Amino acid sequence: VCFPPNEACSEKNMIERIKNAPELFLVAVDKETGKIAGSLNGLATDEEVFRDEFFKDAYLNNSEGKNIMILGLSILPEYRRQGLARELVRQYALKEKKNNREKLILTCLDAKVPMYLDFGFTDHGISDSVWGGEVWHEMSLDIHKVC
């Protein structure tokens, strides 16, 4: 629903992520309807540079890793433009700060760069990622700067 087919991970990969790193999922639920409004997920690693293999291999998760590779921030269309994405990122960063993580690292398309900059991320330029045949920016957020 939130990602076009060329950018979406397979159902199998998502199930593997849930099995291997359930603690790295954060889900927003509409209190009135009980409907899932959005989610954020990632894998922990000591690596500093995003690579496409993180999308495909949940076994790359290192529960002691100092960084989190964000693999998906998804907000259903009817919940967008209400600050939910910002709040999910903030809550996720605060949670991972307590786990002694250092950075959230992600890739995003050009159109999303301003949003992530507004959230406090730094744009490191074009990523080596070729996921979905797209051109991606690599961005990071120093978790210790989040309050």
Label the predicted regions.
Residues 4-32, 39-50, 54-60:
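Active-site rim helix/loop that mediates acceptor-substrate recognition in acyltransferases
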Residues 24, 102, 122:
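Short acidic/polar active-site loop segments enriched in Thr and Asp
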Residues 35-74, 80, 130-135:
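Conserved acyl-donor/pantetheine-binding loop and adjacent beta-alpha core of acyl/acetyltransferases
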Residues 75, 81-94:
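Conserved acetyl-CoA-binding loop-helix of GNAT-fold acetyltransferases
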Residues 89, 95-109:
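Conserved GNAT acetyl-CoA-binding A-motif
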Residues 102, 109-110, 125-147:
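C-terminal "cap" of GNAT-fold acetyltransferases
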Residues 117-127:
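Conserved acetyl-CoA-binding loop of GNAT-fold acetyltransferases
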